[in-house]
Amino acid sequence: MRVLVVDESAERAEVLRDGLRRAGYEVSASLSSPLALLKTIDELQPDVIVIDTDSPSRDVLEHLVVMSERGPRPVVMFASDGAPEVIREAVRAGVSAYVVDGLDAARVKAIIDVAVARFEDFQRLRSELAEANLKLAERKLVERAKGILMKTRGLGEESAYALLRKSAMDRKLRIAEVARQLVDAANLLGA
């Protein structure tokens, strides 16, 4: 597993890199400033990002938000600042594990394992939510299309659905796509 290390302190970064290597991780790069974070992530495509900081700066959190939108990955943050609002901001920015009060090289592997597991669970939940929202939107679209057919053709609900389904099968499209086309056409015609 490739790890990108971000730490403004060269001494702490060396301790962290050493702990990661001993735990079996490949340290792909080490940054002393978060300014090149996005560029480095794009170039190296690390599996995990480990950030060691006294308190996460606004710049670091903004970079993490952008990274999460582009290509989310687990982020572990070791910080001295344990203020609840700082932790909440870090988690909202995409931090998978926020560890307060110092870096212990012996615990790094366990912390990264937990962060990766939490990240994977969160990604699975996010995917399931997106799928559920899509199905709900498609169901609403089919209901609108049925309503249009019922109104314009004088059909019952079952007949309207059967007509949508037949049209979808004849055109080798999903029923939601046929419904979308019908709703779009009705909107265009003002029906």
Ranges and model annotations:
Residues 24-33:
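Short hydrophobic/Thr-rich beta-strand motif most characteristic of the beta2 strand and flanking loop
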Residues 49, 73-82:
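A short, hydrophobic beta-strand element within the central beta-sheet of small alpha/beta folds
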Residues 130-191:
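C-terminal output/effector regions of signal-responsive regulators
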Residues 85, 103-112:
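C-terminal output helix
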Residues 1-12, 16-20, 49:
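Conserved acidic segment of CheY-like receiver
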Residues 13, 33-38, 47-67, 83:
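Conserved phosphotransfer microenvironments
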